[in-house]
Amino acid sequence: MSDNYVLVDPLSSKPIDCWKKYVKQGRVCEPIKPMRLDTPIFENKVRFVCISDTHEKLHEILPYIPDGDVLIHSGDFTNCGDIGEVIKFNAEIGSLPHKHKIVIAGNHELGFEDGEEMSERQLAGLNMLGINKAYELLSNCTYLCDKSYEAYGLKIYGAPWHSMPGYSFFRQRGQKILHKWNQIPAKIDVLMTHTPPLGHGDFNAWDKMDGILCGCAELLNTVEQRVKPKYHVFGHVHQKHGVTTNGETTFINAALCDHKLRSAYDPIIFDIPLPPGKTKQ
């Protein structure tokens, strides 16, 4: 882990105020146009295809998912972690041709969190939903939970944590969720999380707790101050599908469903040059 430790922001529990402070400090969030989905695939570049928040609608989206070398799904592929939903998703993602298919859980993958403390889910009335260790049914993809994966010499890390109470993988804003982000290693190429970082793809008009911004300040600071990946891919917020940049990292909200869980958006693609000495063979 890098020596550049990230500290909890005193305003992390107030995302709107926190982001206003960051803007005054000169933090950058610039929208950029996604690559065209019909862009040719090159032998000297790794093509990533990004999707998230398919919410039991992957079968509707399959015909529109372009080919590529690495497919990544940033969580919420089910609605409640039901065993039938997981089996269905596994079959559907298995039908795609991508050589590497990498998946993380989202808050809707109930039961996927090992050793989950259930009090929040009980309060939300969700404690009877989901199946423990249902991720073991994902035989057609690589499931990451606070783990790394390497494809074509490129390092990818996946983490499912978020700050929405009542669901699996919930951690409070501040030190508790920062503890999880501290596990992300430096020198990775692609970071996958379910929740967005503060200020990038996190506009949520339906969030009743945090107003219109629900991204994580500790995640943003981890990305910008310590990890500095080339790409950060996430979902969770359905209203802000798209691509932004801070000038160093490209941020991708790859959520494909709208707030009514209707398939509404296209996958997003990007390329990373093959590292020296690496091939796709």
Curated annotation (Swiss-Prot):
Pfam families: Metallophos (PF00149). InterPro entries: Calcineurin-like_Pesterase, Calcineurin-like_PHP_ApaH, Metallo-depent_PP-like, UPF0046_metallophosphoest. CDD domains: MPP_239FB. Coiled coil: none annotated. One of its GO terms (molecular function) is hydrolase activity. SUPFAM superfamilies: Metallo-dependent phosphatases. This is UPF0046 protein C25E10.12. It comes from Caenorhabditis elegans.
